[in-house]
A protein has these predicted regions:
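N-terminal non-catalytic structural scaffold regions of very large proteins
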Residues: 2-208
Length: 208
């Protein structure tokens, strides 16, 4: 009679969810499948500070509980997104705001945040080319649900591509201007039931 039953739990499908947080921040929360190097991350758009309206940042978790904020513009460029594509999706003003907010060390900071989570004294900073390749490889190794992405961004991405990040950022711009609706993270269509066998499988296959 000491047997315990592990009930299933609903888990958010891997994908991008665009909505206002409880503190008023407008975010794209990217829920990534277990086992990816990047882990879950966010894209933030500034809409309160009048001097920084429209500036976007990629927010990734580093080794401890802290997060690292990285300007989105150099991330998109490294992922193969052109300036003209950003102009078309963001509009001229927001495109220029993000180009201006770019920092030359952005990709190196992404590399350090992900690759040095254990705070090793042996960490070696990458070259610019290495940092850009690391960014591409890291996102390419992150899986998302094609169904969720189709619902959220209109295209069934299975990996995180430059286009997926561009469309996600563009959706934030649209929401910030009141032209696009937020996503409903609580919708059951964005969740799946996760049972005991799923936890075991995840542990065995992902090394979680």
């Amino acid at each position: 009679g000491g047997e315990r039953q592990l009930d299933g739990v609903f888990r958010l499908n891997p994908g991008a969810y665009h909505a206002e947080a409880n503190n008023g921040d407008l975010l794209a929360k990217w829920n990534v499948a277990a086992g990816s190097k990047v882990g879950s991350f966010k894209i933030y758009i500034e809409r309160r500070n009048p001097k920084k309206i429209g500036e976007m940042e990629l927010i990734v978790k580093s080794g401890d509980a802290s997060s690292v904020k990285i300007p989105l513009y150099p991330v998109l460029r490294a992922m193969g997104v052109s300036d003209s594509e950003m102009q078309a999706k963001f509009g001229e003003d927001i495109y220029k705001a993000n180009q201006k907010a770019s920092r030359p060390n952005a990709l190196a900071r992404f590399h350090k945040a992900i690759e040095n989570r254990k705070r090793s004294t042996k960490y070696a900073p990458p070259t610019s080319a290495e940092a850009a390749q690391f960014l591409r490889d890291t996102f390419d190794g992150a899986e998302v649900s094609a169904e969720t992405m189709k619902s959220s961004l209109g295209k069934g991405f299975e990996k995180i591509t430059g286009e997926a990040l561009l469309l996600s950022a563009a959706k934030l711009v649209g929401i910030s201007k009141g032209k696009v609706k937020e996503d409903d993270r609580q919708s059951l269509s964005n969740k799946r039931l996760f049972g005991a066998e799923d936890f075991v499988y995840e542990h065995l296959t992902k090394g979680a």
